Amino acid sequence: MAAEGPLTGRLALVSGASRGLGRATAVELAAAGAYVVCTARSTRTGATQTDVDDLTLEGTLDAVRAAGGDGEWHRCDHTEPDQVEALLRGVLDRHGRVDVLVNNAWGGHDHHEEADGEEVWDEPMEQFRAMLLGGAYSDYVTTLLTLRLAMGPARSGLVLTTTWHTPEPPAWVPYESSKAAKNRLVYALGYHLQDKGIGVVAVAPGWMRTELMEAHVAPEVLAGKTESPHLAGRVMAALAADPEVMRWTGQVVDVGELADHYEIDDLDGTRPHGNAGRYRPSPVPPPLPGEGG
């Protein structure tokens, strides 16, 4: 039997769920009782990352069930509207609802390395295009179709987006700029949906010990500077269960701040604040015309 919890009876769709933060979020939502639809491009017959074994959708569903939850998986490229629409129509035919959408699909690093000292004008132009498509554009496609087919008619739902603070001072140009596009999308959607009963919140974790990070970065470099992706996953489960989640709508909120608010700890019992001092508070969308003071 699936886990019972604050999200029992609700359906969550998590994109980019084959590894890292997406997998951890799927597991934590399932542990809180949600039925989780896991999507990504990587399956056991074709994975985008092979440096670590079983970073696949099947592996994620195994982890969901090991946590006492249940769900299903579907291969989907979230930059392709036809694929996303077919996915959503299938989910709605089978389950009749989508209560929580987690926009976590990325892929911006699939073929690009982080800047390493070259001049700004020497960074490959293709990086920015890939990051915009894999980030803000895939978020836009998936969110609009979910609103159109599910949350809009229901006048309820929660859209969560995983992101990165735009730090001060700015760092890697294509990465920072593409994340800023994601964040502004959340702000704009939050503004326009605030009277529809649909929340839109971006969560910004610190430096995470994902499977690929642990495979490629020395343990002594990660020690004391990182958090597990389950901290952000637990925070998103708490947001999904919060009847007052609209207080955060349209904002980019730090995972450490949310962990303090909901009194949530990481897997090891710590509560990291990896972003402290490196970002500005997110702006709050203004009231719609004729509303508020």
Where are these regions (language model features)?
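Active-site loop of short-chain dehydrogenase/reductase
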Residues: R10, G69-D70, R97-V98, A150-T163, ...
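Catalytic loop of short-chain dehydrogenase/reductase
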Residues: G107-H111, E119-M131, D139-Y140, R148, ...
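A glycine/serine/threonine-rich, flexible loop-to-helix segment
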Residues: T48-D53, D116, D195, P205-E227, ...
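C-terminal helical subdomain
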Residues: A202, P219-G293
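Short-chain dehydrogenase/reductase
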Residues: M1-H95, G107-E119, E126, G290
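Conserved Rossmann-fold SDR core element
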Residues: L29, R97, N183, L193-M208, ...
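Hydrophobic structural elements of the Rossmann-like NAD(P)H-binding subdomain
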Residues: V102, L160, V200-V203, M213
